[in-house]
């Protein structure tokens, strides 16, 4: 039962792909120093990344108003690249740490410049320049992105979490909760709620989404010598299963998937009635995201004997969209909007 060793994590873009594509995207900005056009270029860069790396999130974000959609795409680029550095780049641990440190220094340095064009002319990447512009416009505190990069650094050296609270407070906060916070600023709060209430809702949803991703990726993570299931969790025989996952034991991997998905289910339920905290024009996309990933999580729970990576079909994804939005979504996908 050790054939999982042969399974390879899917590599979407190599490090060179990232560098080449970034060079071309950056060149477009430098050719035309117009603020509005530069935001569009930064957003298009983010859209290319989002479409390539997450078809599910790409689909639900088509339901956002144009301005918010553009800003979400920029945010996605800023969180996807560091994640790929850690998980996909063929580099030593120290080389990955150095890239993340340089990325953090770029982010801090970017505060010194007025706009995207000026940042690019001072050796700031388009990924960071676009994200800094979003942070400036929405007044997103720098500490959240620093926390995100710190969480990415933790993934370079596998960490052990003693219980759910330890995992949520000391890893998921940086890797997912703060991303939910970024989106809260962009989505905005309704007249009857506050930014703080939106952030609490985003926190619960971010935890749920991250736990679902952990559940789906247990097999791939075990190849990397990584296990996010807390050390205190036990299987139906009351046996600790953490070491079994690290050692690629199929039964323990399946048990881990189910425990993670069950914990995720609790967090989906916690935020399901609080999506109205957000502005009306953002709710459809947020509800679609909640429904889509809940469906994926339930699929993991139902396929109790499957240790492979679950996914939703195109039909399953489209089925979560209200029928009166089919045309809008179809046009957006066909026209690559």
Stretch-by-stretch model annotation:
Residues 1-209, 215, 220-337:
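Catalytic cores of Mg2+-dependent Asp-rich isoprenoid enzymes
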């Amino acid at each position: 039962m050790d054939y999982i060793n042969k399974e390879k994590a899917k590599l979407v873009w190599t490090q060179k792909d990232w560098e080449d594509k970034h060079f071309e995207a950056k060149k477009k900005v430098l050719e035309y120093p117009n603020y509005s056009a530069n935001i569009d270029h930064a957003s298009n860069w983010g859209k290319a990344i989002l479409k390539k790396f997450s078809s599910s999130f790409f689909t639900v974000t088509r339901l956002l108003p144009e301005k918010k959609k553009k800003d979400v795409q920029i945010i996605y680029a800023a969180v996807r690249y560091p994640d790929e550095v850690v998980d996909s780049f063929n580099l030593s641990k120290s080389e990955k740490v150095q890239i993340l440190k340089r990325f953090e220094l770029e982010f801090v340095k970017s505060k010194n410049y007025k706009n995207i064009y000026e940042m690019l002319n001072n050796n700031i990447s388009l990924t960071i320049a676009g994200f800094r512009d979003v942070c400036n416009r929405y007044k997103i505190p720098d500490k959240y992105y620093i926390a995100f990069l710190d969480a990415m650094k933790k993934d370079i050296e596998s960490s052990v979490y003693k219980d759910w609270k330890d995992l949520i407070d000391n890893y998921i906060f940086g890797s997912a909760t703060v991303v939910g916070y970024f989106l809260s600023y962009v989505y905005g709060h309704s007249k009857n709620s506050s930014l703080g209430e939106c952030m609490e809702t985003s926190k619960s949803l971010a935890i749920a989404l991250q736990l679902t991703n952990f559940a789906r990726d247990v097999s791939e993570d075990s190849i990397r010598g990584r296990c996010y299931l807390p050390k205190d969790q036990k299987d139906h025989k009351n046996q600790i299963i953490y070491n079994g996952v690290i050692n690629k034991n199929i039964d323990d991997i399946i048990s881990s998937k189910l425990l993670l998905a069950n914990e995720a289910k609790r967090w989906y339920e916690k935020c399901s009635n609080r999506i109205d905290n957000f502005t009306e024009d953002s709710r459809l996309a947020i509800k679609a995201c909640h429904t889509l990933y809940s469906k994926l999580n339930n699929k993991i729970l139902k396929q109790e004997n499957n240790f492979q990576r679950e996914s939703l079909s195109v039909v399953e994804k489209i089925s979560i969209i209200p029928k009166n939005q089919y045309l809008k979504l179809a046009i957006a996908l066909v026209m690559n909007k």
